[in-house]
């Protein structure tokens, strides 16, 4: 499959074709404006190779240049400071020395076993992207073609995946015990748990479980946190009684979350929390947040072929928001 470029002037069109484009899997990513883009999918350590085709549209014309190159770029862009993009990967291959083009040409390129340390990501305030960039250097205006790729980071975890179990409450009014079966979930996993009411002296009208995503960008005083409720699961509608136990089952596959991303290049983090919310008859809201880790599980076929995918996270701490009264 070809990546068709636009016209850079009336003379030349730049086109990039990957060597394994006919067999390589593609992945989708939602952009900041809500549109869905589809690009070829790569993993950490995979090589990227193909051809750069320069097609002349007007035979007989000449294109003078100061050199032709292709780059593999990994870049982080903060939307509130678009002038300050940070490249954490930049590999360059020179395709041609200074000269002139008088006819269509093709150039082979290969970036061997490219390190791709982070997952592609587009959020509310930040974008992490990988792309190929072809530049025809000219005296006045360079001709440039950028071509996006998508990178997924695959994680493996040991068999030990502790459950989360806590007792919370309001003194002499409400005392509940909640339990989630794991603390780390892959993106297609099911969150299974239960809520057990030990003491109920206030009238609970409604109870739900929320999956909350927090995107933290910047450092120090310039830190910005964007909070989004990814999923809501109604646990009960009505008053519980002492001794009642209510099951929880939340399917993550229906919500398309990203993996947890911790301190990516000291620029941003993406963290996920389970938020247990209770609403009483006076519409007061009580809650308890617990951080969980989301990770991308390697497909079975890929797990058998490759054993070098491993991504570790620090043990998360439970964190509660100050926006609402905590149980």
Swiss-Prot record:
Residues 316-327 have a biased composition (Polar residues). It is a peripheral membrane protein. Coiled coil: none annotated. It is found in: Cytoplasm; Endosome membrane; Early endosome. The keyword rRNA-binding does not apply. Its main location: cytoplasm. Residues 306-327 are annotated as: Disordered. InterPro entries: Arrestin-like_C, Vps26-related. Induction: Down-regulated in Alzheimer disease. No polymorphism or variant is however associated with Alzheimer disease for VPS26A. Keywords: Cytoplasm, Endosome, Membrane, Phosphoprotein, Protein transport, Transport. The keyword Membrane applies. It holds the Pfam family Vps26. The modification Phosphoserine is found at residue 315. Gene3D superfamilies: 2.60.40.640. GO terms for cellular component: cytosol; early endosome; endosome; endosome membrane; lysosome; retromer complex; retromer, cargo-selective complex; tubular endosome. GO terms for biological process: endocytic recycling; intracellular protein transport; regulation of macroautophagy; retrograde transport, endosome to Golgi. Component of the heterotrimeric retromer cargo-selective complex (CSC), also described as vacuolar protein sorting subcomplex (VPS), formed by VPS26 (VPS26A or VPS26B), VPS29 and VPS35. The CSC has a highly elongated structure with VPS26 and VPS29 binding independently at opposite distal ends of VPS35 as central platform. The CSC is believed to associate with variable sorting nexins to form functionally distinct retromer complex variants. Acts as a component of the retromer cargo-selective complex (CSC). The CSC is believed to be the core functional component of retromer or respective retromer complex variants acting to prevent missorting of selected transmembrane cargo proteins into the lysosomal degradation pathway. The recruitment of the CSC to the endosomal membrane involves RAB7A and SNX3. The SNX-BAR retromer mediates retrograde transport of cargo proteins from endosomes to the trans-Golgi network (TGN) and is involved in endosome-to-plasma membrane transport for cargo protein recycling. Belongs to the VPS26 family. This is Vacuolar protein sorting-associated protein 26A. It comes from Homo sapiens. The lineage of its organism: Eukaryota, Metazoa, Chordata, Craniata, Vertebrata. The gene is VPS26A.
């Amino acid at each position: 499959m070809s990546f068709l470029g636009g016209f850079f002037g009336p003379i030349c069109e730049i086109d990039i074709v990957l060597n394994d484009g006919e067999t390589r899997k593609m992945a989708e990513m939602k952009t900041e404006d809500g549109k869905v883009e589809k690009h070829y999918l790569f993993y950490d350590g995979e090589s990227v190779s193909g051809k750069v085709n320069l097609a002349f549209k007007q035979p007989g014309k000449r294109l003078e240049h100061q050199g032709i190159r292709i780059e593999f770029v990994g870049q982080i862009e903060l939307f509130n400071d678009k002038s300050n993009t940070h490249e954490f990967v930049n590999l360059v291959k020179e395709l041609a020395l200074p000269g002139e083009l008088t006819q269509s040409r093709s150039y082979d390129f290969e970036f061997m076993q490219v390190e791709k340390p982070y997952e592609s990501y587009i959020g509310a305030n930040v974008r992490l992207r990988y792309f190929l960039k072809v530049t025809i250097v000219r005296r006045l205006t360079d001709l440039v073609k950028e071509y996006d790729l998508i990178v997924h980071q695959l994680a493996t975890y040991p068999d030990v995946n502790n459950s989360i179990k806590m007792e919370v409450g309001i003194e002499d009014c409400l005392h509940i015990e909640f339990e989630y079966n794991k603390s780390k979930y892959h993106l297609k996993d099911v969150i299974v748990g239960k809520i057990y009411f030990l003491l109920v002296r206030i009238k609970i009208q409604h109870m739900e479980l929320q999956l909350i995503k927090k995107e933290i960008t910047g450092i120090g005083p310039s830190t910005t946190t964007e909070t989004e409720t990814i999923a809501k699961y109604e646990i009960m509608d009505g008053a519980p009684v002492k001794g009642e136990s209510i099951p929880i089952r939340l399917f993550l596959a229906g919500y398309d979350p990203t993996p947890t991303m911790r301190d990516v290049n000291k620029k941003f983090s993406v963290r996920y929390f389970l938020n247990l919310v209770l609403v009483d008859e006076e519409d007061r809201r009580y809650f308890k947040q617990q951080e969980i880790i989301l990770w991308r599980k390697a497909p079975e076929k890929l797990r058998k072929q490759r054993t070098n995918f491993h991504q570790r996270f620090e043990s998360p701490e439970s964190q509660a928001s100050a926006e609402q009264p905590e149980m």
